[in-house]
Amino acid sequence: MANTVYDDSLGTSSLAYRIDGGDDELGLTGLFWLGGFKSAMTGTKGEAMADLARATRRRSLRFDYSGHGESAGLFTDGTITLWLEQSVHMFLRHTKGKRVIVGSSMGGWLALLIVKRLQAEDPSAFRRISGLVLIAPATDMTQDLMWDEFGENEKQELAETGAYVRPSGYGEPYVITAKLLADGQKHLILKQPLHLPFPVRILQGTDDTDVPVSHAIKTFDMLTGPDITLSLIKGGDHRLSTPAQIQLIQETVLNLVNRADGVSF
């Protein structure tokens, strides 16, 4: 079990992270895990990626965004801009060599934003990305899955108080701030094509009420490239955390890292 260590170099929040698996010196393609909104790196899927890394002796990095898990900061201070900057920072500072990025829910959106940023600003880092696995990607969630879905009461509460307390089917209610929604406007990407030269795998449950199948199809349609697939998991909800679903996620990730390593089947 990896110990939690902290990165204080950003100067904004102390970010908790864990490194699992083997050493980069082995030359195997590693993993970079991005969790979801209000999720911790020690959740079921984050642990599954760590287990896969250990079993295959490859390096895996996972971390908590500020206001999440073991990281410092208030959740209500978070924005997509802030969490994106933290994600890019962790990728550049704590990974080397080839990586497959695995993003769940909001982490899927952040994965696409990282790719877009590096493609434009850091081609050498972009070339290290060997593939994406997007699990129920909540692309443009602040607009499509939050604001556009809110009724007049929710919008009035946001206007009057600057926040809306949203019930959660997974635990305590969470606070959605007007600041988060406004900031999200800077990062909307669904309306313009994004070309990716590496394999992309989207995994989506058919019974997901948080990120519906229709939204996953929007992400799929927005992406262009030689090897992009969308797989529907019948009966799967947003968590995709049953043993069979976790095994499917691990097998999907393993397929991409093996391909990047030049392993033939």
Where are these regions (language model features)?
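N-terminal cap/lid segment of alpha/beta-hydrolase-fold proteins
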Residues: 1-24
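The alpha/beta-hydrolase serine catalytic core
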Residues: 125-233, 237-265
